[in-house]
């Protein structure tokens, strides 16, 4: 049978199955079979230079919705379909073949684990290996001739599922290249990378004999020279890094530290791709393979991901070196994706602003019932709204328990300090954006509260996954207005998550007065906060099937409610309204009061919101992550002309060519 294929994304040719099989064994970076089925025009020709990695010009920009992934059905999420034309070496391990109960003791008896790592993990007094750990540790260590892809829910112990095999490998090779990096772990965010480093230190603390296998984190927002001094001093065997900083180090010091890498781990691979790191990950893999002293295909790759869509599969095919790749699926298709131990509920108000009152009243009740022994995380849609909520909660509850603000605009040192503090505290409230939604492991969180909807459907699952960790129970409360109810239906349709507990809420005059007294922001600041929310929600309209004419005016009405005058509208200039594409829309007139001036209160702050402001709309995935001032991988910000936020209008009225950094 003849099959049409593409070599290096160029001219189609006809080939037999034998030729296809031969091509599949070629170097994946050099030969790309059927690559153009998934990629944009010029991405097939790889180049390790940064200019090529930053080339993102061929992405579609005509509609803000073109770049948004379609909502997947429940059947799509349950059954992972691999395209054999691009991933022919995959071996799908049936769940029934990998369902035998595994314990640390059994792994020790079988000779899979050394007594030193067994001692360290046992001293942590875990109740037992989690299902993810049971299904992955032994297959990872059983052979050096295959890579591994593992699909697992959030909060299921993925970190130790790859740390235990890494330490076992270091023990097995302790006399080989003792002072070289042997394992590289790539994480999507600084905070997750530092958290993985903290887990490594726990293993060190439980068995001092393992401290000789040193670990160093390489993340943005920290001093590069200090990190290199630490690398020279410790000569680590394990490096945990974010992609941008890792590439910086590899380009300068790959020969010095990274010639003996045996393991490469991608944690939260789907999130890495979601943020825009695909080219960086392929570059990292290419450099590590090229510099490896043993062979270009020596490195074993472990890829952990909550979802395995076409993009994740494509990445796996491009970066995995071994002849075989095991796929281990630890997700039961009969279970919903949200953790089964989480008690979920939704509180529905008439107005968006009432969700703020409802959340404050709920927290007051919990503090009273728990005698101030209350630990919760509150998620908010944008940075400005997060800061606003934190201010209100501090004015309300600072005498009862600590209130912490956490988002990407905070410096890395402060973020690290906040994470350590909240992990240690028995009580407190962490107010954050989605930067804290994935991978962060905070112990003993009683509740996750959400005011408004997340930027993406999957983030609801990752948000609530911050509670009910390590076998404990927890609860989640979603505070929304009636116009946000389509989000709840979308959760049920697309993710099989049914929130049975639903209650309506109407604030009393007492709680409204109490909260409004805690509002200290000026009207201009309130308008900025509400406009950031409008930006957020406008980007979600199509995905969640919101009614634009209802949801946007409802969000805008929050301005008047917070200023204790429901009739007030947000004052903006006509020029600003033009930028939003709403100057002739009835919706714009319902939301804003047009004032023809460009400055206020005698200062330089303008209602026009110039191009360097943070009012571009969120949700556009067509951005180049390496050139943005981002809150994930965090090398020092390099401003360039293409980094300016553009309000270019299209027929869709919502086409913005850069991503809103205000949401994280």
Swiss-Prot record:
InterPro entries: DEAD/DEAH_box_helicase_dom, Helicase_ATP-bd, Helicase_C-like, P-loop_NTPase, RNA-helicase_DEAD-box_CS. SMART domains: DEXDc (SM00487), HELICc (SM00490). Its EC number is 3.6.4.13. Residues 139-326 form the Helicase ATP-binding domain. A motif (DEAD box) lies at residues 267-270. Residues 48-68, 639-649 have a biased composition (Low complexity). GO terms for cellular component: mitochondrial matrix; mitochondrial ribosome; mitochondrion. GO terms for molecular function: ATP binding; ATP hydrolysis activity; G-quadruplex DNA binding; G-quadruplex RNA binding; mRNA binding; RNA binding; RNA helicase activity; RNA strand annealing activity. A motif (Q motif) lies at residues 106-134. Residues 653-664 have a biased composition (Polar residues). ATP binds at residues 152-159. Keywords: ATP-binding, Helicase, Hydrolase, Mitochondrion, mRNA processing, mRNA splicing, Nucleotide-binding, RNA-binding, Transit peptide, Translation regulation. CDD domains: DEADc_MSS116, SF2_C_DEAD. Residues 355-512 form the Helicase C-terminal domain. Residues 42-79, 602-664 are annotated as: Disordered. Residues 628-638 have a biased composition (Basic and acidic residues). GO terms for biological process: Group I intron splicing; Group II intron splicing; mitochondrial RNA processing; mitochondrial translational elongation; mitochondrial translational initiation; mRNA processing; regulation of translation; RNA folding. It catalyses: ATP + H2O = ADP + phosphate + H(+). ATP-dependent RNA helicase required for mitochondrial splicing of group I and II introns. Specifically involved in the ATP-dependent splicing of the bl1 intron of COB. Also required for efficient mitochondrial translation. The Q motif is unique to and characteristic of the DEAD box family of RNA helicases and controls ATP binding and hydrolysis. This is ATP-dependent RNA helicase MSS116, mitochondrial. It comes from Saccharomyces cerevisiae (strain ATCC 204508 / S288c) (Baker's yeast). The lineage of its organism: Eukaryota, Fungi, Dikarya, Ascomycota, Saccharomycotina. The gene is MSS116.
């Amino acid at each position: 049978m003849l099959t049409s294929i593409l070599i290096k994304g160029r001219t189609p040719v006809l080939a037999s199955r034998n030729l296809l099989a031969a091509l599949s064994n070629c170097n994946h970076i050099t030969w790309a079979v059927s690559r153009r089925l998934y990629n944009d025009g010029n991405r097939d020709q790889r180049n390790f230079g940064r200019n090529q990695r930053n080339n993102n010009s061929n992405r579609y920009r005509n509609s803000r919705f073109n770049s948004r992934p379609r909502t997947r059905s429940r059947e799509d999420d349950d059954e992972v379909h691999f395209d054999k034309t691009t991933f022919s070496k995959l071996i799908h391990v049936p769940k029934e073949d990998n369902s035998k109960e595994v314990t640390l003791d059994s792994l020790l008896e079988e000779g899979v684990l050394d007594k030193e790592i067994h001692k360290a993990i046992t001293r942590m007094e875990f109740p037992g290996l989690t299902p993810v750990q049971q299904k992955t540790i032994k297959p990872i260590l059983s052979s050096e001739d295959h890579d591994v892809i593992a699909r697992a829910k959030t909060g299921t112990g993925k970190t130790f599922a790859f740390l235990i095999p890494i330490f076992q490998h270091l023990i097995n090779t302790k006399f080989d290249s003792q002072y070289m990096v042997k394992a590289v772990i790539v994480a999507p965010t600084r905070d997750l990378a530092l958290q993985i480093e903290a887990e490594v230190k726990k293993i060190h603390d439980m068995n001092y004999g393992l401290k000789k296998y040193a670990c160093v984190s390489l993340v943005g927002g920290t001093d590069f020279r200090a990190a290199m001094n630490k690398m020279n001093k410790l000569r680590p065997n394990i490096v945990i890094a974010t992609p941008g900083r890792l590439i910086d180090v590899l380009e300068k010091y790959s020969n010095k530290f990274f010639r003996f890498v045996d393991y490469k781990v991608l944690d939260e691979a789907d999130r890495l791709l979601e943020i825009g790191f695909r080219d960086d990950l392929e570059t990292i893999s290419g450099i590590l393979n090229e510099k490896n002293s043993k062979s270009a295909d020596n490195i074993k790759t472990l890829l952990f991901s909550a979802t395995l869509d076409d993009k994740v599969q494509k990445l796996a095919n491009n970066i995995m070196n071994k002849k075989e790749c095991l796929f281990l699926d630890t997700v039961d298709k009969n279970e919903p994706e949200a953790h089964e131990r989480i008690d979920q509920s939704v509180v529905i108000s008439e107005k968006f602003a009432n969700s703020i009152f409802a959340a404050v009243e709920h927290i007051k009740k919990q503090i009273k019932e728990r005698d101030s022994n209350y630990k919760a995380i509150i998620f908010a849609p944008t940075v400005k709204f997060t800061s606003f909520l934190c201010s209100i909660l501090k004015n309300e509850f600072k005498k009862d328990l600590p209130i912490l603000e956490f988002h990407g605009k905070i410096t890395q040192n402060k973020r690290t300090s906040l994470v350590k503090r909240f992990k240690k505290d028995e009580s407190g409230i962490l107010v954050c954006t989605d930067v804290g939604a994935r991978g962060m492991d905070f112990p003993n969180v009683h509740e996750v509260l959400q005011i408004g909807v997340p930027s993406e459907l999957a983030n609801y699952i990752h948000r609530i996954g911050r509670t009910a960790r390590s076998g404990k129970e927890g609860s989640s409360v979603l505070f929304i207005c009636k116009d946000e109810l389509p989000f709840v239906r979308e959760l049920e349709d697309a993710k099989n998550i049914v929130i049975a507990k639903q209650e309506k809420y109407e604030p009393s005059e007492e709680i409204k007065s109490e909260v409004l007294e805690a509002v200290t922001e000026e009207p201009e600041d309130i308008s900025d906060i509400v406009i950031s929310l409008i930006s957020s929600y406008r980007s979600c309209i199509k995905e969640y099937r919101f009614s634009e004419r209802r949801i946007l005016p409802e969000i805008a009405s929050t301005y008047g409610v917070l200023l204790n005058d429901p009739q007030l509208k947000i004052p903006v200039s006509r020029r600003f309204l033009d930028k939003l594409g709403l100057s002739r829309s009835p919706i714009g007139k319902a939301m804003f009061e047009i004032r023809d001036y460009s400055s206020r209160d005698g200062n330089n702050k303008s209602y026009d919101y110039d191009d360097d402001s943070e009012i571009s709309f969120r949700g556009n995935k067509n951005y180049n992550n390496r050139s943005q001032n981002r809150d994930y991988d965090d090398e020092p910000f390099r401003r360039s002309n293409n980094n300016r936020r553009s309000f270019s209008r299209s027929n869709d009225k919502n086409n913005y060519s850069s991503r809103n950094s205000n949401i994280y």
